[in-house]
A protein has these predicted regions:
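Short loop/turn motifs at secondary-structure junctions and domain boundaries
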Residues: 58-60
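Short glycine/proline-centered loop/turn elements that form peptide/ligand docking sites
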Residues: 78
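Short amphipathic alpha-helical segments, especially helix-boundary/capping motifs
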Residues: 15, 62-63
Length: 100
């Protein structure tokens, strides 16, 4: 099931923004005009990935430097050992719809 979480214009290119999806923080990253959604909480120590740095399709956690691929949620560099949950996303009529 998909729910509206915001508008595509809410996430500028090269940025990440956290939204609430049924009580869970979900980050949406805009990499070169493509939007990717993933759970906002780093699997290492629980820091918000929305406060991290986006470089292409790699987000770096601001707390301890773990890196994740925003397209899949996979860990690219520790200390995190587990991926973040990647979520399907759609844009319809300018609205961002994320998988619950």
């Amino acid at each position: 099931m998909f729910v509206k979480i915001g508008n595509a214009t809410d996430v500028a290119e090269g940025n990440i923004r956290a939204f609430d999806v049924d009580g869970t923080k979900v980050s949406v990253a805009n990499s070169s005009g493509h939007l990717y959604a993933f759970d906002d909480t780093c699997t290492h120590m629980g820091c918000s990935l929305a406060h991290g740095k986006l470089d292409g399709t790699t987000v770096t956690c601001p707390c301890h430097g773990s890196q994740f691929d925003v397209t899949s949620g996979n860990v690219l560099r520790g200390p995190a050992q587990r991926p973040v949950r990647s979520r399907a996303i759609q844009v319809e009529g300018g609205a961002i719809l994320a998988e619950t």
